[in-house]
Regions:
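A glycine-rich dinucleotide-binding beta-alpha-beta segment and adjacent secondary-structure elements
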Residues: 193-243
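Aromatic-enriched alpha-helical interface/lid elements that frame and gate functional surfaces
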Residues: 122-194, 198
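Active-site-adjacent "lid/gating" segments in soluble enzymes
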Residues: 1-134, 138
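Amphipathic terminal alpha-helices
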Residues: 209, 267-281
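Alpha-helical scaffold segments in soluble metabolic enzymes
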Residues: 63, 67-71, 146-150, 174, ...
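Beta-rich nucleic-acid/ligand-interaction surfaces
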Residues: 92, 167, 206-210, 280
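Flexible, small-/acidic-enriched active-site or ligand-binding loops
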Residues: 223-273
Length: 281
């Protein structure tokens, strides 16, 4: 009531209400509880761990940013702020887009490797002869034709149209055997000149050296508190204004300044440091 224009956002695992509101959790738990993990994996192994924190980042952080920005726009129209209760498990549940819609309407849950986009078709990763991987996402007819012609598998074009799992398993096996005949570098070179939705699985450092990301300015340098330059991944937001990239400070770097702003005296601050209550860097 004292600050009606205030926008206050909290991000927690399960939100401020509901039976799980006081329970601890991590990204893996939110993916499990939301249903995302129930179809993200292999029939042979079950659910797989994602290398990035989907619920934390794509779920919690991104939903929080969108909610705050939407609230800023609403406040400009109404003059009122609001409290935003962002739950990472809610946000993960909301990421069940196409599979969620079909499951609720058809009352049939997706399974591991049974759907178009989770391995049911030949949309998948394939190992090369030197134990690296290609991603093949040739779903549309033009890309399917381009892929199979390049692999010398035109005879399978008719079978592609038949989306029964047995048929698709056979096609995946044939493609897998074909990809295993050449090295990662050989396939990368060949498919770089072919528009078939096939890309190599790169390491982070390989991706950072890729001409596309370099030209798109996806790398930047930040200055740390000692004046050293640190290479970092840039934001994907295409702002045209010049950005000043500064690396974060070490834990405790501003402890004294913060406490002084709260009217703590030098002796009080020194006592807190000596007793280990706070850290100074």
């Amino acid at each position: 009531d004292k600050h009606p224009k205030l926008i206050y956002c909290s991000i927690t695992g399960y939100g401020q209400t509901g039976p799980l509101k006081n329970k601890a959790g991590h990204d893996i738990n939110y993916l499990a509880l939301s249903g995302l993990a129930s179809y993200s994996g292999r029939q042979e192994t079950g659910p797989v761990l994602s290398g990035t924190q989907i619920a934390d980042i794509a779920g919690g952080s991104h939903h929080a940013v969108m909610a705050v920005l939407a609230s800023v726009i609403e406040r400009a129209n109404t003059g009122k702020g609001q409290y935003l209760d962002i739950s990472m498990s809610d946000a993960a549940f909301a990421l069940n887009t196409m599979f969620g819609a079909s499951a609720l309407v058809g009352e049939k849950d997706p399974g591991y490797g049974t759907e178009m986009l989770n391995g049911g078709l030949f949309y998948d990763y394939y190992k090369t002869s030197d134990d690296r991987y290609l991603s093949i996402g040739s779903l549309e007819p033009a890309f399917v034709i381009s892929l199979l012609k390049h692999l010398g598998l035109e005879s399978y074009l008719v079978k592609i149209a038949n989306q029964k799992l047995d048929n698709q398993s056979q096609i995946k096996k044939v493609i897998s055997d074909k990809i295993a005949e050449k090295t990662f570098d050989q396939w990368t070179k060949e498919f770089s000149e072919l528009d078939a939705c096939v890309e190599p699985v790169l390491s982070i450092n390989e991706a950072a050296a890729h001409p596309h990301f370099i030209q798109r300015n996806m790398l930047c340098e930040a200055i740390d508190q000692n004046g050293h330059k640190i290479k970092q991944i840039n934001t994907a937001l295409p702002f045209k204004s010049t950005q000043n990239h500064t690396a974060g400070c070490q834990l405790g770097h501003h402890s004294r300044e913060v406490l002084e702003s709260l009217s703590y005296g030098d002796q009080e601050i020194d006592h807190l440091i000596q007793t280990g209550c706070i850290k100074i860097s």
